[in-house]
Amino acid sequence: MKLHIALWLCVSSICISYSQIKQDTINTKTTQLPEVIVTGNSNTDPTHSTVKNDYQKKGIQPKNVADLFSEINGFSTIKRGNYAIDPTFRASAYEQLNVMYDGGTKAVHACPNRMDPVTTHVIPEEIEKIEVVKGPYTVRYGATFGGIINMVTKDPNKLDKGFHGKASAGYETNGNALVNMLQLQHVSNKFNITGNIGYRDFDDYEDGQNTTIPSAFRSTDYGLKLGYNLTAKQYIQGHWRQSFGRDIKHVGLPMDTEFDNSTIVSLDYRAEDISNTLKGITAKGFYSYVDHLMTNENRANFNMVFASSPVTSTTIGGKLETHWLFNNNVNLYVGTDANLIGRDGTRTRTIKMMNGNMLPNPMVRQDKIWQDASLNDIGVFSEAKYQINKTTFTAGLRLDFVNANAENLENDFASIYGNDVKQSETNISSTLSLKHNISSNTIMEVAYGRGVRTANMAERFINHFTVGQDSYEYLGNPLLKPEINNQFEIGFQGHSKLNELNNFSYQLSAFYSVYDNYISAVVDTSIPRKFMPMLQPQFTKVFTNIDDAYKTGLEFMFKFELLEDYYFQNQSAYVRTKNKDFGESLPLNPPFTSTFSIGVDKENYWAKAQYNLTSKQSHIAPSFGETETAGYETLDVKLGATLFKNITLGVACLNVFDETYSNHLNFSYRNQPDFNMSPITEPGRNFTAFLQYKF
């Protein structure tokens, strides 16, 4: 707790002390908080990075956060229902991706089955853009193994002075889904304030065979953001956000969510142009708390046992960074950051039936879920960018000091690992890259990154819970080594003007990763199943490190812009993983995907037809219960127009041909009386409408 308080005092003291710096009172510009990616600035942009930034312009359908990733090449989603959806990029998922809001704010899920991933704690319509760093190619934003995802909310400082607002409403026919949001903003020379509130109500959807898939949920979100210009070159911003999920069905998990409440608070500070050499100081502090309750009250096994699991997660973190400029061509970033996680929770089981017979007096048992676990990471880093002629070199080094512990162990867990499971690590990450302008319209990027990920809490401390995509109970291992990703990548991007009306652009990337100490799980026949021991599988999986694994793949995009406003585009992504120790792929390896889009993009209207091709996936991990999945093809059509000056209407038909299909990454139906253990099917044909009014 002392460390938590110290982090907040550090941020506050920096803000107060630098606010005393004498500044010119004439406000010629407004200082803005830094973003991970500043598009077009090769001096500061991370190598192999991209940005998707048309969410605010073309809100043409109601969506959950997963939809925000659907058009970014290389992304897929892991689906357990219509709510608990995780992004995956190049076969990296969960903590292998460094997912954040606004450059560093994080909220860690409380549920061991990830019913409440980080992407559920923000209003999707609030996101202005998503920034992606495609590998461990920067050390400035925390420990990064497979890449960075930064979801950026709207910056009020980019608006004109005065009062602004927008109201939006959307509807989907498949699932009778309704979404609403209201946002109000005021911007002046000295301060800005933004408030928003959103409500979402989704019912069960139907797949292409008109089978009803349990997937309903409701959520209410609100947020308040306040920014203040201390001087012309200093800016401070506070952000308060709360989300309340209710009655959430998870068709691919053994339980459902009764409620999921989260609170996220952040404080950001930035000072610019402090001296000729010291160009800036940024500081961030954040706090998040997730309160989650899951039960099996509406599940098939409720008559045999009632299970109720209240769990909590607390995350406290911060960052302090200085930006130095030497000789006008060397940018140096030096700083420190922290990410402190605590989790706890207990499952209470009321056993009503044993050996097929109803008990006259039900038995009550309690199981420790997180065993009062903590995982603290304090990092220090330095990253330099050196520009000479047409080439920018980047080199970075990072040290992470990790401490993990669980203080309330179950007896059987302690009998295996002892009563003291506290572990400490010092992890070294690094990157080296270059970005070269071959010509005025062609860029080459070459990069190496060494990303290190410490084992997460489930991998360390979970005790006989089914937390994977298979039916095994999993046992944590506090002795796990951190996994290492040595990733190499080369990429080209460019554009050319074919004539006065037509243009061509392209991107191509190829990557290869060598994994050391990759964290997986193996069946241990000496450890039997703990709960319901008569069921299969009979034994327990234990998390372990494997010696020999790799990942390779490529991504390709080309786009023809025709007659200025029309376009044809293709995006394709392929990734192949291999676990040589097991003689199979790593789990959750997405299949080859390719999309073909044709559309028009004019100032007052736009339209797009997109053909989505997903291949059969035969590169699977049978030891994790994976089976081959068939390929499929779908067609989406989206239209939008500005009806009046401030009113936008978007309509769409998704899955036009009402296909029945399952993505390879979807979990299988679990604890459902009317479904076998087959992968969750996706929604069938779906008509959507989205209306937005800006003022």
Model feature map: region roles:
Residues K106-G135:
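Short acidic/polar hinge/loop motifs at secondary-structure boundaries
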Residues G223-K225, S309-T322, L375-G379, L475-K481, ...:
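Outer membrane beta-barrel strand-and-loop segments of large Gram-negative receptors
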